Amino acid sequence: MAKRDIIKNQFHTYKDTYTGTNVTRLTEPDHVSHHMYFYNNMMTSDGKKLLYSAELNGERQLYLMDIETGDAVQMTEGTGVADYSGMITADDRYLIYRQGERFMKQDLDTGEEECFYETPEGWSAGGDLGPSSDYKYMSIVETRKDTTAKRKVGGNWDAFAENCLAKPLCRIVYIDMEKGTSRIIHEERCWLGHTQIRPIYGDKILFCHEGPYDLIDARLWCINIDGTGLTCLREQPSDLIITHEIWMPDGESVAYVYKETTGKMEENIRMIPMSTMKEEVFMNCSPYAHFNVAPSGKYMVGDSQGHDVPIHMLDHSKEKDRTGEVKNDFIYIVDVEARKEIKLCYHGSSWRAIYGNSQDTHPHPFFTKDSKHVIFTTDLEGKPCLYMAEV
């Protein structure tokens, strides 16, 4: 298949057994498909088209799906397409994605492309792209290749601890996507990830020290875009999991999931306002692996993990638990004003890294533009598929 080819997805709608929610499977379980990384902008402004990845004919490419008809246009071709990296610019004009070490901008109308940045020789680019709200700038992490751990074959978690302990030389790069210029913001011997430019303000970059929770010094870090003001946002003892931090849409606070592995085993959503830099407990929650915020800021959504064992420590040698037990693998909606959690539907993901990428079975839920649906990924019915639940 090639760029601009069209595939036709067959939708299947059902009522969730546990909540009665209407859920529509958007792709078919005979091949792997998933949406982009959960905080990427992957829908057009009118909410009618969805950017996702599908593995067909042995390779993963990006597709743009009409969520009313299921028709999807192939947007990329060739090897090395980073299947979680794509995003649509706020003005709906361009698709931004990474292919190998090249960062591409594709005109959605004409299909014309240009490379606006390429990682230098000897370095490798990470998968996460952190755009500014106006999509003029982007932050990424680059790692010097000769400092990383020797990764084992397969899209599993074997190298997660090894790469953390190797303390690779990483740097945060700030890119002007319009001018094609760049500068290095920060560099250190530590595995860095998840750079996110502060919404609205655009003055800071949130990033993490990546690796198992009991091996890193602290996960949450922030730095000004001029490279000054490096700040650890929160101390992190070795028995505490802090995960999947995000900016609130107004850029005023950083939010994240806090989970104790000893003592009271407390789990809740917490925030750090930039005005005070003092942590606030927002509300207790189910054991979310990831959570996201609606564009309006009125709702949150989380994918609960029924296993007590952290994802990277699961036994990934088998496909799924076959006991028939229904664990707390549900999608939850949070009413921000009421601080109330509501069970939306069962995602039933196996959480297993067996399809080629360790992220493939992660639900990674996010809201559609009008907040009337939540889209997520699960391998509930076969290989990972895209699902859309009515809120």
Over which residues does each language-model region extend?
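Loop/turn-rich, solvent-exposed surfaces of beta-rich toroidal or solenoidal domains
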Residues: 283-342
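Blade-terminus and WD-like Trp-Asp/Gly-His loop motifs, strongest in beta-propeller folds
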Residues: 40-49, 85-94, 98, 128-137, ...
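Short, conserved, GDST-rich strand-edge loop motifs in beta-rich repeat architectures
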Residues: 4-6, 140-167, 208-217, 259-263, ...
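Blade/loop signatures of beta-propeller domains
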Residues: 2-24, 164-170
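Conserved blade-ending motifs and adjacent loop-strand segments that build the rim/top face
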Residues: 237, 280-292, 339-366
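Blade-level signature of beta-propeller repeat domains, shared across WD40, Kelch, NHL, RCC1
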Residues: 361-391
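Asp-box/WD-like beta-propeller blade repeats and closely related beta-sheet repeat scaffolds
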Residues: 80-170, 184-187
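Blade-loop segments of beta-propeller domains
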Residues: 32, 36-39, 57-100
